[in-house]
Amino acid sequence: MAAEEGGLNLTVSETLQSLLESYRRMQMPIQQYLSFILIPSGAFFVVTIVAAILIDLPMSIRAPIPLLGLLAFGAALFYPKILISQRKRQLNNRFHLLVTHMTVLATTNIDRMEVFRKLAREEEYGELANEMHRVVQLVDTWNQSLDDALRRRAKEVPSDAVSDFFDRLAYTLGAGQSLKDYLITEQEQIIQEYSTVYESSLDSLEVMKDLYLSMVLSMTFALVFAVVLPILTGTNPTMTVSAVIVMYIFVQSGFFLAIRSMAPYDPLWYHPPEKSSPTDERATKSFAAGVGLSLVLLFVSFGGMFGFSPVALGDIIPLVSEPLPLPMYAAIPITPLLIPGLVMRQEEEKVKARDGEFPSFIRALGATEGVKQSTTSMVLRTLRKKDFGTLTENINSLYKRLNMRIETSEAWRYFTAECRSYLIQMFSEMYLVGREMGGSPKVLGELIAENMNEVLQLRQQRKQATTTLVGLLYGITAASTFAFFIGLEVVNILASMSLDLETSSNFDVGTLINTGVYDIPLIEFLLIIIIMFGAMLSALMIRTIDGGHNMNTYLHFVTLTWIGSLTALATKWLVNVFLSI
């Protein structure tokens, strides 16, 4: 017992210490935060408590008032902690790319401070670029040495990986070792740290999947009870079902936000706003076609249902007769969204294939340039004849632009824009900058290829996690829909049986079961809503973990909705068949 109390005290102490540390690391002074945010929110909490005591209203209205004040005070109290956690995540997300970029710059003929200045101007690195800028400010403005500036920032950054890197770099530079030698020897350790963080994120997602499964099963049972129990208690089933659905939506949304915060940052796509590609054109056309057809089907289906459309679904879709089962009115109108989903799925596979070929290409390019001591266009003249899969066409386009004397940097930017790959864009930019500043092409090619291969191996693990999640969500959708409609159909059959009993005898069935409180079509409509909401959130979860294009969401959304709709129809048919025997 004493050990448990000691462990609890230690946990509370660690939490308080972590919270105080987050206050210390805020950009805003602590006194200013206390005066303008924390103390006013605490006063607001006290006011809500007093108001709940003094106001002459029913308890059901007064009770939530202090909860509003508690929410405001809790948000103000823990906001610095949340802010520091976000900064830590931003620092860790691109850390391996920044170190690789730093190594590329260090292999060139520029001063080590110029390396930090260039990285500070790279907006792509976000919070890491800000840290580089702070280091540069300490050196340029406050006349500190680079190693002293790094030690000072190591104490302030919330990321352990970045802090440790700054500490070791400061010690190495202070000892007289060159930045280039240190970074080349550190590459393997940095990638290993990134792999550890990446894999731990995937492990956390595995735990979240188990928790999500337990939550959905619990909420499914709650919803089934909300459908069935009113037949015995006589309460309004529409209210109980609506209450459970609202809770279901909040809990599912919370899990989605948690999964989004845990997923490793590893975007697949690169979207340059100033340069379009054939991929953009196909995406735009497929999106317009899918959304346009969905709107037409939506108008026809509901217009035919309510009588304000001259045609119905049965008139334009073969083998469909009116009236349709209610689940079909949810599934059929959104089916055309498969068009953009499938198109972007194909384009995404091409991007992944280009990513797989790029390490071989950049290694061959660097090695050949190093041996021949010639320009990139001269090397590409022979290199483009090799088979690099889907990347070959982009390499040919790069060669043609360089051969037309288009500026080298602009030709490479067109190359990355056509590839549409985030990694290819980042590493191509590093190679280009390294070559322009006199770096060894062979060293650059080997360095970039090795780092990209490590990231691609981690992506394979991410793909396996996504595949497992897809199977889990598809199975959960079918199982929960089956449970929903079993309860609804049992109630529907009991209601029809009670009517038969009342007409065939003088027995008052209402003393045993309360079927008159049910509005079956309305409850079925509510169940269809929760199926579609679950399909939407499940599709978003898959896209978040997969890291792919936003339009991939449509593919899983439509598929999950059809699974739910067909399961609902099959369940209703099976229950009627078995109970009629």
Spans of model-derived segments:
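Bilayer-spanning, highly hydrophobic alpha-helical transmembrane segments
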Residues: 34-56, 65-74, 196-258, 297-299, ...
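Hydrophobic alpha-helical segments characteristic of transmembrane helices
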Residues: 1-23, 97-119, 149-153, 160-203, ...
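Juxtamembrane/interface alpha-helical elements of multi-pass membrane proteins
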Residues: 62-154, 164, 311-417, 425-462, ...
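Hydrophobic alpha-helical transmembrane segments in multi-pass membrane proteins
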Residues: 130, 160, 164, 215-223, ...
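Juxtamembrane boundary at the C-terminal end of a transmembrane helix
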Residues: 570-581
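Cytoplasmic juxtamembrane regions at transmembrane-helix boundaries
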Residues: 278-287, 355-367, 543-561
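Selective transmembrane-helix segments that form parts of the transport pathway or gating/packing helices
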Residues: 37-41, 127, 131, 287, ...
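Membrane-interfacial amphipathic helices
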Residues: 1-55, 79, 83, 257-326, ...
